[in-house]
Amino acid sequence: MYTYVGKKRLSGPKAEVEDILEELVDVMEEKYGMKASIMPVGSVRSNLVTADEDGHFDLDYNICFSKVPQDVRNNLQGLRGRVRKAFDDIAGDLFFYGRERKSVIRFEHSEESYNLDLGILIRNNNGQYCRLVVDRKSREYQLNEIALLYDASKKEDYIFSHNGKDQLASLYLKNKNKHPETDSFHIYLEAVNTCLLYTSPSPR
């Protein structure tokens, strides 16, 4: 059974992760000439992080690169490796490298009961951000457009501005417990879309 992580318990891990990620941004620019920013994602952005029965939870963030040299764009696997190594060098023994997932690098905390799932985004020539992913069949590294991510952020803002956060929190937790095998971000997106139907004005 999933439950929400309270703000007090969440504040320490979030601060710890964000300090490391901000240093990661500095290192990537100083060492590789790559400009980036950090973006909390989904339930982290809306402070609706859930923990399982053992108290374990995930924190989802993206590192968003707005400037990437062409030689780096031509070696996406190498970019992912650079991000992972730089994070490892900064975090030291606090985190260890877990398994690599399709769209994120998972870092597991060595002492606390939580993970960091870090996505890598790169801005393309059209000014849109694309996510660096690994194709599960071919094992090739690719860039996929992420319109859903920014669409969800706009919907969240609308829901929160129309006093719909409690409804979103209730629905997300209900669906999370109903479908524990499903990826949390997609459950969250579904909850956002459902809540939007109730908060949007009805057509006349």
Predicted regions and their residues:
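Conserved small/polar residues in nucleotide/adenosyl-binding loops
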Residues: 198-204
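Aromatic- and glycine-enriched beta-alpha-beta binding-site module
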Residues: 57-97
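Transcription/chromatin regulatory elements, primarily intrinsically disordered
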Residues: 163-179
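Active-site nucleotide-donor binding segment shared across nucleotidyl transfer reactions
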Residues: 28-59, 63-73
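Long, charge-rich alpha-helical interaction segments
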Residues: 189-192
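Conserved catalytic core of two-metal-ion nucleotidyltransferases
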Residues: 32, 80-126
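Helical scaffold of the NTase/Pol beta-like nucleotidyltransferase catalytic core
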Residues: 1-40
